[in-house]
Amino acid sequence: MSKGFANPRETWDARFSSDEYIFGTEPNVWLAQHADLFKPGMRVLAVADGEGRNSVWMAQQGLQVDAFDISPVGIAKAKKLAEQQGVQVNFSIHGVEDYPWTTGDYDAVVAIFIQFADPDTRATLFKRMKSALKPDGVILLQGYTPKQLEYKTGGPPNLSHLYTEELLQDAFGDLDVSELTSYEQVLTEGTQHHGQSALIGLVARRPFGCNFQ
């Protein structure tokens, strides 16, 4: 699904090839600010988890975490981070197209800066994320808005890959959207998300009785 790159696996392997964790080892701020959404024992899916900073943090909160990424190099670093922190995460090497998506299995699906997907593949991905939720399960998502093209402090250079409130409302309006906000903040998430940033955050819950299959 990473149509922004000719060979996404090779691209991300190259980016993750240094010893440095390029997005840092601390969790994404939007995710950490919503820690109260999570209860120990909840089953959570981390989409395109990269080097593991977010999945490892969720495991530290007592969650049962499945996490995948297209990059074997990224997953190897994620496993190392989990071992260092003394937590268990079920990591697997998959892109979003070949991941074995299931229906109604997760209390939460977390998607942080997954803006490698073009509009068509993004629509499919969002549908799969919704279908993966249990009733009353929650999606937590963060991305960049078009204004990020001015800051150039992270994220894709493609306007079509960026999010607006209208885009996310259209994609997730069949959920109960409790938060959908565009804002600016200085990020210090490694070397790749660093500096003034134009952000958007979403929290949306699957209503009982809704069927996204």
Regions found by a protein language model. Give the residues of each.
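A short, conserved alpha-helix within the catalytic core of class I
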Residues: 116-129
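Conserved SAM-binding loop
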Residues: 78-79
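Conserved SAM-binding strand-loop segment of SAM-dependent methyltransferases
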Residues: 85-97
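Conserved class I S-adenosyl-L-methionine
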Residues: 1-39
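Short alpha-helix
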Residues: 160-181
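A short acidic, Gly/Pro-enriched loop at the edge of an enzyme's catalytic core
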Residues: 97-108
